[in-house]
Amino acid sequence: MGYRKLGRTSSQRKALLRDLATDLIVFERIETTEARAKEIRKVVEKLITSGKKGDLHARRQAAAFVRHEVVEVVQVDAKGKDGSTVKKNRPVYALQKLFDDVAPRYAERQGGYTRILKKGPRRGDGAPMVIIELV
């Protein structure tokens, strides 16, 4: 099975795919070149499928690939030292969003979690641009 080199060394390519896959999970829609989008699609489909399994092994495999990035900060109630209720800020990470929000959304779907929409050429170099989004 082939893959695109994307004009980079293997470590640079892996870092690029990690960053773009994490951004797609966080924002659920990104704009990139067509070749990159087709490669990200493979990675994200596998991540979401492992997210649907939801076991510890799947979570650890996804954690090894997805960047440790804060998606949002939510306020939760917690008990203070004196027993009173206080509000605390708790970060929500990309991995947590993948397993708690994105994967359950596709519980009944067997693959095909992403959509690629063609946008037109980039102004600077004419590279074909697309929007890749979660369905």
Swiss-Prot record:
MF-aspect GO terms: structural constituent of ribosome
Keyword set, alphabetical order: Ribonucleoprotein, Ribosomal protein
HAMAP family referenced in this protein's UniProt entry, alphabetically: Ribosomal_bL17
Gene name per UniProt: rplQ
Biological process, per Gene Ontology: translation
A single GO cellular-component term on record: cytosolic large ribosomal subunit
Complexes and interactors: Part of the 50S ribosomal subunit. Contacts protein L32.
Keyword Ribosomal protein: yes
PROSITE patterns listed in its UniProt record: RIBOSOMAL_L17
Keyword Transcription tagged: no
Pfam families reported for this sequence: Ribosomal_L17
Domain of life: Bacteria
Protein family membership: Belongs to the bacterial ribosomal protein bL17 family.
Annotated SUPFAM superfamilies: Prokaryotic ribosomal protein L17 (SSF64263)
Protein name from the UniProt record: Large ribosomal subunit protein bL17
